[in-house]
Amino acid sequence: MRPWFSSVARRLALGASLGVVALTVIPNLSCAARSVSVAETESLRRLELLRVEIARHDDLYFRKAQPEISDADYDALKQELRELESRFGRRVPRDPAALRDMGDDRVSGFPKARHRMRMLSLEKTTTESGVRAFDQALRRLVKPPAEIAYVVEPKFDGLAISATYEEGRLVRLVTRGNGEEGDDVTAAAGRIRTLPPRLAGAAWPRVVEVRGEVFLTFAEFERINRGRRENGRPTFSSPRNLAVGTLKSLEPEDREVRQLDVVFFGLGAIDGHAAPASQTQLLEWIAQWGLPSVEDARRVDSIDDAWRAVQELGGRRSHLAFPIDGAVIKLDDAVGQTAAGVSEVAPRWAIAFKYAPARVGTRVRGVALQVGRTGVITPVAELEPVALAGARITRATLHNASEMERSDLRVGDFVWIERMGEIIPAVVAVDTAQRGTVSAPFVFPRDCPGCGALLVRALDDANWRCTNDDCPARQVRKVEHYVSDEGVGIRGLGAASVEALVRSQRVREIPDLYTLTAAEVTAHTRLSAAQAARVVDAIQRSRKAPLRRVIAGLGLPGIGPAGANALGARFADLPQFAAARESDLQQVEGLRPESVRALATALSAERTQQLLARLAAAGVGAQSATADAGTLAGKEVVFTGTLPTLSRRRATELVEEAGGRVADRVTAATWRLVAGRNPASKLHQATALGVPVIEEAELLRLAEAAPE
């Protein structure tokens, strides 16, 4: 095995242990195996594992925005697959999808829209020789090659987006998807603070598709995480993941809470206007149209100057206000771009240079074990403090027991740390050459660190698990999840307060929250009387949370946000949901068979039934009564802009408590558009469709409610 690939190999082995990369026969691969020697059988198996693992990581990165490995490790997977496919030649059918440089970010729950012009990705390289090879190939395509100038731009680390403006008005916002069609996220345009609903001036095309990237600045990312830390909530892993999650959330978001940005640097279809003569002119036009453009672009006259610009930008990236993961080199001249043409997935006149992730070495002081709400035990390396990309790193995840065993990580080892996505610190390699003469493999304890119960681990499981449902550590995590924004959203009840309430045994399970008094909260936590009163008020309001949010907060097996939404739409209230059988769950659109089985098993458990019954008795999840009797029963409301006194979440709660529903898009079915400061394109859509527009005060009157 290649030494440089050891960390990737461990992850592949981990995937196999999880059952994710079980040996699934690729069409004709078993036949091909008959024509190879016994010595090549293992290589064939590895080739198959690589294809499955790459597909899994594509899904995690492009669709779920939850990458598990660094870009460098991902690129290494693809490189080894290329080498194996090359070695076997025609004896093994190739899998073009596994090696495509363009993923597919389309997910369920969004309408699809076709791009007027195909939206491409970029070829990538990580070496200077790759950059120079690109230059040589381009010179063979562009005649004459003497006048070749380049534009070097930052490679923003966000979500690729295409905005269509017709007659100067924003009419469509679409993700790249598979290049031909993407997810229509026009309804979320208001979440991007720098995206104008209208172009500036008048010298714009009749129709134009502008391409760019939606991202989150480091300052905004840190502001969001700082607030979550102060409230005891889990922090987000990276700006890119949060940007993708915010734009593609099916829940209405408060723009004051998560403020996205966008930058444009490319062009799709253009009608009623001459095409730009160069990339430089395009960037100038984008700025003249009032759109955010690339400010750090640099025009250079040679590949030598381009390489110097790439290196200089790399040296400044830790000081930039936004995340980048590379630099893009583009041929400036539009005529030359046309001559160079495009491949299946990328233009031949541009290339992205990916920067190596920041890496530092340090020693492992110890290994801490964290207990999750499902009982999974996660090992975390406690490190000698080290600076990495401007941050002080003291801890890094070790993923699970299987990964630790395969890496043979030991206390005292010298390890290499990288920041995945420039944010998440991860142990990527163990330097055994620096290991002391006296060391011992880490042995997982057999007792739960949270309750002392015996830990168990199935043969095919990568994790040790605590099976004690009454484990205080598990209960803390369960309650934390329930009160979080992913659940019913009880503001002011942070991790420290939840832990104090559970440790004091005043809160043993989630339903105990609904019997808390302000005096008890004050007695068992560090909250003041005023803070405790607000917490109890928030708890009482959460009784009216929609069923979908209650289900999401319970964290039932196999059910994520999308599944909770589907279940909330299917069942009238919590008792009806509790009574659901497997045959009922099979009728819920969007639930996978394995999720149905896991949920049916959970609902059949006496403990689950008791918990749901207690919640129902507390008046939780009784959405049908509210929906039938509310002043907004059956009415659809859409929000745009920032409201004067209500957060977007609270405004949504008011509508739902009054029996209405909140949508992200203005359609003919919209009852009212509630407009605040800085409204987005929804205001124009409402005017065009004849939808009445009201302000917050009118909403409060109609909902017969008052602001917080």
Swiss-Prot record:
Binding site for Zn(2+): C448, C451, C466, C471
Disulfide pairings: none
EC annotation from Swiss-Prot or TrEMBL: 6.5.1.2
Transmembrane domains' residue ranges: none
Cofactor needs: Mg(2+); Mn(2+)
Record key words, sorted: DNA damage, DNA repair, DNA replication, Ligase, Magnesium, Manganese, Metal-binding, NAD, Zinc
Example GO biological process: DNA replication
GO CC, one annotated term: cytosol
Catalytic machinery residues: K155 (n6-amp-lysine intermediate)
Xref: SUPFAM superfamilies: BRCT domain, DNA ligase/mRNA capping enzyme, catalytic domain, Nucleic acid-binding proteins, RuvA domain 2-like
Reactions performed catalytically: NAD(+) + (deoxyribonucleotide)n-3'-hydroxyl + 5'-phospho-(deoxyribonucleotide)m = (deoxyribonucleotide)n+m + AMP + beta-nicotinamide D-nucleotide
Example GO molecular function: metal ion binding
Binding annotation for NAD(+): D71, A72, D73, Y74, D75, S121, L122, E153, R176, E213, K330, K354
BRCT domain segment(s): 627-708
Catalytic EC class: ligase
InterPro entries given in the database record: BRCT_dom (IPR001357), BRCT_dom_sf (IPR036420), DNA_ligase (IPR001679), DNA_ligase_AS (IPR018239), DNA_ligase_CS (IPR033136), DNAligase_adenylation (IPR013839), DNAligase_N (IPR013840), NA-bd_OB-fold (IPR012340)
Stored Gene3D superfamilies: 5' to 3' exonuclease, C-terminal subdomain, 6.20.10.30, BRCT domain, DNA ligase/mRNA capping enzyme, Helix hairpin bin, Nucleic acid-binding proteins
Role played: DNA ligase that catalyzes the formation of phosphodiester linkages between 5'-phosphoryl and 3'-hydroxyl groups in double-stranded DNA using NAD as a coenzyme and as the energy source for the reaction. It is essential for DNA replication and repair of damaged DNA.
Family: Belongs to the NAD-dependent DNA ligase family. LigA subfamily.
Record-linked NCBIfam families: dnlj, PRK07956.1
Protein name: DNA ligase 2
Organism: Opitutus terrae (strain DSM 11246 / JCM 15787 / PB90-1)
